[in-house]
Amino acid sequence: MVTGNTKAETFYSMKELLKETGGYAIIDGGLATELERHGADLNDPLWSAKCLLTSPHLIHTVHLDYLEAGADIISSASYQATIQGFEAKGYSIEKSESLLRKSVEIACEARSTYYDKCKDDDDKKILKKRPILVAASVGSYGAFLADGSEYSGIYGDLITLETLKDFHRRRVQVLAESGADIIAFETIPNKLEAQAFAELLDEGVAKIPGWFSFNSKDGVNVVSGDSIKECIAIAEACEKVVAVGINCTPPRFIEGLVLEIAKVTSKPILVYPNSGERYDPERKEWVENTGVGNEDFVSYVEKWMDAGVSLLGGCCRTTPTTIRAIHKRLVSRRSLFSSSSSSSHH
């Protein structure tokens, strides 16, 4: 059992965490939209990483909101935080690296604050001492470009495997050494970038494991048009990858994708979809009323778990309310899991 700031080495295998949490674990929800709700201005290529500079206390608040809603895994505000991105803003390499470290430290501090709060009782919050993992979020090269290419996966012929490895190497290293338990390689838009991440892990750039999560806009392939099965096969072959799945994708596509993924992986499957709202890249805003409400989002949860999902949460436009609703749904599922696993021991 992990307490306080103890590193979660016991969960080098994601399977151990899942055993502790009754077969299903909850990932947090959207960070950027919550930060905006708390008053942050994210109109910037750095997006939520801007708050590392301007309002770290808001990031801490949002992490804590998710833990109190029942999340078992919280992700750092580093999705769009890159050394190159900070340098473009005029920051030194040292300052850029310290901001990456800070993103993980804030999440670790929120976990400690949460553990302290677990001594109190509050009916409205889930205050339960449990293993909580801090995931260091790594967005794609396209997320750094902030030109929408993370949603197309088309980087052009000039971007090679080596370009991508060089781009991510130091960032992954710094995040891995900052106290995180796992690296979340998120919204991976193509096979080439998955290969780059896998090779960095194989080369020992990070001492901690990672998860690979892809995005899809058609429910069949990843956004670049690469086959989801081929992308998952890259993750499957990498020993340091401890879970695979889908994020930043409309809920209606998830079940079909998971059924495909389950055919080619033995690793735990994770999903954290968007609310389903459409993003308008021209206007840089979400189109209201194009998504599903919390009830509808949660109504999908059973189907996803039946299809083989073990870790679930939300991505863009999902909130602590979404996560609390998932937690409620999982409580009954977890009790079934524990009764069936105890009966299977006789």
Swiss-Prot record:
Which key words tag this protein in UniProt? Metal-binding, Methyltransferase, Transferase, Zinc
Give all residue intervals belonging to the Hcy-binding domain: 13-330
Q: Which Gene3D superfamilies match?
A: Homocysteine-binding-like domain (3.20.20.330)
Distribution of this protein across tissues and organs: Expressed in roots, young leaves and florets, but not detected in plants not exposed to selenium.
Molecular functions (GO terms): metal ion binding; S-adenosylmethionine-homocysteine S-methyltransferase activity; selenocysteine methyltransferase activity
Query: Pfam families in the record, alphabetically?
Result: S-methyl_trans
User: Which one GO biological process term can you cite for this protein?
Assistant: response to selenium ion
User: By what means is the activity of this protein regulated?
Assistant: Inhibited by L-methionine.
The protein's required cofactor(s) are namely: Zn(2+)
Please list the reactions this protein catalyses: S-methyl-L-methionine + L-selenocysteine = Se-methyl-L-selenocysteine + L-methionine + H(+)
State where Zn(2+) binds.
Answer: C248, C315, C316
- SUPFAM superfamilies xrefs: Homocysteine S-methyltransferase (SSF82282)
EC class name? transferase
Q: Which domain of life is it from?
A: Eukaryota
Q: List the EC numbers from the record.
A: 2.1.1.280
The record's listing under InterPro entries reads: HCY_dom, HCY_dom_sf, Hcy_S-methyltransferase
Induction profile = Up-regulated by selenate, but not by selenite. Down-regulated by sulfate.
Please describe the relationship between pH and activity: Optimum pH is 7.0.
Q: Which function does this protein serve?
A: Catalyzes the methylation of DL- and L-selenocysteine with S-methylmethionine as donor. Also methylates DL-homocysteine, DL- and L-cysteine in vitro. May be involved in selenium detoxification.
Name it.
Selenocysteine Se-methyltransferase
Q: What is the lineage of its organism?
A: Eukaryota, Viridiplantae, Streptophyta, Embryophyta, Tracheophyta
